[in-house]
Amino acid sequence: MTTLHNLSYGNTPLHNERPEIASSQIVNQTLGQFRGESVQIVSGTLQSIADMAEEVTFVFSERKELSLDKRKLSDSQARVSDVEEQVNQYLSKVPELEQKQNVSELLSLLSNSPNISLSQLKAYLEGKSEEPSEQFKMLCGLRDALKGRPELAHLSHLVEQALVSMAEEQGETIVLGARITPEAYRESQSGVNPLQPLRDTYRDAVMGYQGIYAIWSDLQKRFPNGDIDSVILFLQKALSADLQSQQSGSGREKLGIVINDLQKLKEFGSVSDQVKGFWQFFSEGKTNGVRPF
């Protein structure tokens, strides 16, 4: 029979080992089998094994947490890069808007606010532009301007936080706003229909369409002095292009419903104009003897 303990192999004590110590360490022993032989393990060895197992478990758990954190950071950075690429692709087609984004002025203002918080930074961006895609674009410009500025490391970290937050929470909103900007900008150049309501109406139609009554109500509120017929035509063209780019799926079905409803609104608008004209005809007294009621 083989005996194992934490001081020696076999029953013979090591050189200069005190016998009474060795015997006291083998008082509590565990009997078992190892490769066909009987094995005795002293209690001190069992405790050492347990301690090592606990330590190894802790190390692996710690490494797993670090790995998970790194993976989350990598995913967040990838999301920011994806959104940034699409924003640059679409907004670069409207250089007039990019010229309004004075990053150096923004950097100068923020660098004088060492204790600015994330919510304050977002509020400041919203004050510069109500469009999320433009806010994201400004943040990207700030991030690039802060490279090589170690004295503004706190601001650089804050900007990175804001980019990750916007990409994760408003990614689709940002991309849709950027995607429709070139067409919306051209439509707004007539001076009748403003740019931002055009972007908002398109985005709502894609992300959260609430039905024909809701969109008609939105059109009335957002374009009180605008040309609603031209807005409907603008939406039809934009959504039809989106529809053609989608091969199948629920998104395609939803777009089809919105486009059909817009056509109904267009026809309704035409009838509404006729009714208004008819009513004006009578109100001006051009009845030729015909009574309105």
Swiss-Prot record:
Q: What is its main location?
A: membrane
Alphabetically list the UniProt keywords.
Calcium, Cell outer membrane, Membrane, Plasmid, Virulence
Instruction: List the Gene3D superfamilies hit by this protein, alphabetically.
Output: 1.10.150.630, 6.10.250.670
Compartments reported by the entry:
Cell outer membrane
Which InterPro entries does UniProt cross-reference here? HrpJ-like (IPR010812), T3SS_LcrE (IPR013401)
Gene Ontology biological process terms from the UniProt entry:
negative regulation of protein secretion; protein secretion by the type III secretion system
Coiled coil regions, renumbered to chain? none
> Pfam families recorded for this chain?
HrpJ
One Gene Ontology cellular component: cell surface
Q: Which family does it belong to?
A: Belongs to the HrpJ/YopN family.
* Designated name of the protein: Outer membrane protein YopN
Instruction: Give the organism the record lists.
Output: Yersinia pseudotuberculosis serotype I (strain IP32953)
Primary gene name = yopN
